[in-house]
């Protein structure tokens, strides 16, 4: 995957502004081989559990629970639901609840051509890499990886967004039950 010069300049500026905590250019380093890592697979299960998409239909789930039918592209549909008396609107979709804008950025950088389960998995690993957590996931530095992706997925422990999150204990349990190893 090759970023255009303008995209690379933007990515470098973002890397600088975030002091390296968020680096779009890291997404370019992710390959399908990263999906073969057991810790990566287990970590993806944690995210899906947090996002409420761990069931069979998770890859086809819109925000709020409705299902979409085509994997040709992100469904690009904003859905409004009422939770705890508050109306919330979101374009989040798929196993990792990608917003339309996040998916477009991810797909463009990573060269993803559809919204199939394989592309969603690869895109999620790209977002993990962008947050500087992929090496931590692979090495079993679970708590550190969770901390780094909490700004990417609002359902992760420590997320600053004020939405419901899964507990760190639940996240660890899902991770180890899926074969993930915690080393630190």
What are the residue ranges of the model-derived segments?
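Cell-wall polysaccharide-cleaving catalytic domain and substrate-binding groove, primarily
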Residues: 1-113, 122-184
């Amino acid at each position: 995957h090759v970023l255009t010069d303008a995209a690379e300049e933007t990515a470098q500026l973002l890397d600088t502004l975030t002091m390296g905590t968020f680096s779009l250019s890291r997404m370019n380093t992710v390959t399908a081989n990263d999906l073969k890592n057991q810790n990566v697979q287990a970590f993806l299960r944690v995210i899906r559990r947090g996002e409420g998409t761990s069931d069979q239909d998770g890859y086809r789930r819109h925000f709020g629970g409705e299902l979409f039918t085509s994997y040709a592209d992100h469904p690009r549909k904003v859905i409004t639901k009422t939770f705890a008396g508050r109306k919330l609107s979101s374009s989040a979709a798929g196993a990792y609840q990608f917003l339309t804008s996040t998916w477009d950025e991810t797909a463009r950088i990573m060269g993803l051509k559809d919204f199939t389960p394989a592309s969603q998995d690869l895109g999620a690993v790209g977002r993990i890499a962008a947050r500087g957590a992929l090496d931590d996931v692979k090495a079993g530095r679970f708590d550190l990886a969770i901390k780094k992706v909490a700004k990417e997925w609002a359902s992760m422990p420590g997320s600053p967004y004020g939405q419901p999150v899964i507990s760190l204990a639940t996240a660890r349990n899902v991770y180890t039950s899926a074969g993930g190893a915690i080393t630190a």
